[in-house]
Amino acid sequence: MLLKAKYKKNISFFFKSLLISMQNFLKQFKPKKYKAYNKYVIVSAVYNVEKYLDDFFKSIINQRLDFKSNIHLICVDDGSTDNSANIIKKYQKKYPKNIAYLYKENGGQASSRNLGLKYLKENDLNIFWVTFTDPDDFLDRDYFYEVDSFLKKQNN
């Protein structure tokens, strides 16, 4: 393989250039995000699950249905003693309109979910579809798209 002179002098430049070219090529295949027929809320009871939270958030943010327009996440920290709160706050800072963080003393999953529902009602988010997903569960990329498609067909 023949390398251009500028690549011969700095092999790391060659690999960086190659990586950038590959990223630009792959961008054309990035899946399209869809606007939803409905809006959805996830209420999640969080207790000492820091090792799962990044994957949990990614599975929700990367939904085929557009996260910013259609999905709200209410994370209720049930008195976690690990780094869960900081991880949630990191994502909340990035998506302040979509992610709410609530803290309560440890009282169990049911009380956390009830607090999330209370928050939803008090803040009048006007969203009718609620699901409960635990932070150690990861949603398929098409989860909300499929639910939304089904509900749209039922209402027509």
Residue ranges of each PLM-predicted region?
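Conserved donor NDP-sugar-binding/catalytic core segment of glycosyltransferases
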Residues: 142-156
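Glycine-rich, basic loop-to-helix element that forms the pyrophosphate-binding segment
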Residues: 104-124
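Short beta-strand/loop segment that forms part of the nucleotide-sugar
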Residues: 69-79, 100-105, 135
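Cell-envelope/extracellular polymer assembly enzymes that use nucleotide-activated donors
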Residues: 38-41, 72
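Short beta-strand-to-loop acidic/aromatic patch adjacent to the donor-nucleotide binding site
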Residues: 124-138
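Acidic helix N-cap motif at the loop->helix transition within catalytic regions
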Residues: 52-54, 82-91, 138, 142
